[in-house]
Structures are given as structure tokens and as C-alpha cells.
């Protein structure tokens, strides 16, 4: 479009430039492009811990951590009921906490808006799982779909359910794990989800399809009581757990390439029944049991580099274990 105005254009007139698709205003005999900026109103990249077991009972609390500053918010809001062992998943805007025990197993699926801090109950009813069960991990997601695997009813099951995160409604059968399992861990890239059962098996699903999980490779050690996994869009990790004695190892694998996990470093402490949350460059591992006692300590790793974890010098309240871990910046987005 011409930068010269037609005759009679008033000062302050506004137009859409059809060549640049930008808004312009007229001043001093010329058209000028508006300076525009879209502020980030979602609070930045944050991880969340929902529900879980705490000393003396269970909690419905939602707590958050800012990945950049490592500052925690221990009163972000609440899921709809106090329960241990929910599974977590998320898109960029919506967090999901599914199932758990009150102590009886529930089929409840809650959702909440991660950009909005609430006082009191902040989660809403999304729908129901195909059966009531407790996970202690077992969730993963892309931007559009969340998948939940295994758990106890109280018997161990191999069920895989999925939901479409942006909608509401009941979960739908996706397929089955290769065997029944409780305390299944999960982590995802945008296209592929990896589950690790309480043995050395790594199994994968293609998130956008349905069907049974398939063999991916093996961990170096048993994945019992490891909580959920973490990582970026290229690399997933599992760490800690209690194969026979609590462990510290970071075990890493590349989503696009099937094969065995390799050691990538260590956590600061032996930890099991913990929860994790991810951003592209910083992943937090928090809570759970450390040396047999409940812990509220948080450590972090960089998923792009090997090495030991770093203490955040921050903490979550009430030392949660078996909680849902999720974020608005994980590797599946």
C-alpha cells in the first residue's frame, strides 16, 4: 500500500495495511505502523503439584513453582477433594488431576486454569475415568490429549484411558499396557508418550492414535515408586524410585529413538514416591520420601545436560508424596 494518503485524510485516522497486515495511523502527512506488544499474562512457565499424601492424611492443595525464579506458591488453589495418588497432565493453559484414593479409589477427573490463582476450590469437574483407580504417576500429555495408564482399583490394572484436554467429558479407552501395574510413571514428547512400569520395561504409545503400548527399551534399574517422569521435547527422564533400596540415578532416553535408557546423572538425595514437572530447560523433582521420611525439598536438573541435580533452596508445604505433577511448559507441548 502507498505510504501517501488520499486527499482529505484526517490526522489520527487508522487503517489496516493489507500488504503487511498491520494497523497504521495517519500523522504529519504519513502513515505510521502501530507498535504492538502481547504481554504474557499466564504467569510464565510454572510447575504444579496437586493433591497427594501428607503426614497425617491427604491433601487437596494445588501448589506451584516458577521455573525461572524457583519461587513457590503453596496456596495456589485446591482440587475438588483430598486424595493421594492422582495422575497429572496439562496443556499450556489447563491442568488435569485424575483419579486417586480418598482412601477408596475414585474416577474423578478435575481441571483448572493454570494462569489463575484461586483461594479455595479452584478445580472443576471434567468427567470420569473408565474406572476408579489410584495412579501415583501414570499420566502424560500433548497439547491436545492426556493419557492415563495402569494404577490400582485396588487390584493392579493395565488400562489406558485418554481425554481431550480442551473439552470436558468422560475418559475413553485407549488400549492396554503389556502388563498390570501400579505406580506407573509417564513422560511425553509432542507425539510419543513413554510409560515405565515397576520393573525395567519402557513402553511407548503414539499419543494421537489408540492401541496397546509397545516395547521401547529398558531402564538400567527397576522403576518402582518413581512418580512421574520429566524432560523436554527431545529427551525424557526417570529418576529416583525404590527398586529394592531408594535410588538417586537419572536415567535418560531419546523419544524418537527406541532403545535402552542410559545414566545421565544423579539426584541430590535418594527419593521415592516423588513428583516432577518440566520446562524445556529446567525440571523439578520434589517431595516424596527421603531416607524413609516425608520431604518437602525441591531439586532441579537441566534436561539438556548430564550431571547432578541442584537444590532450589525452596520447598512445598506439607511434604506431599504420591501427588500429581504437571506443568504448562512440559516436553509434550
Regions found by a protein language model. Name each.
Residues 1-333:
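Polar, enzyme-active/binding microenvironments
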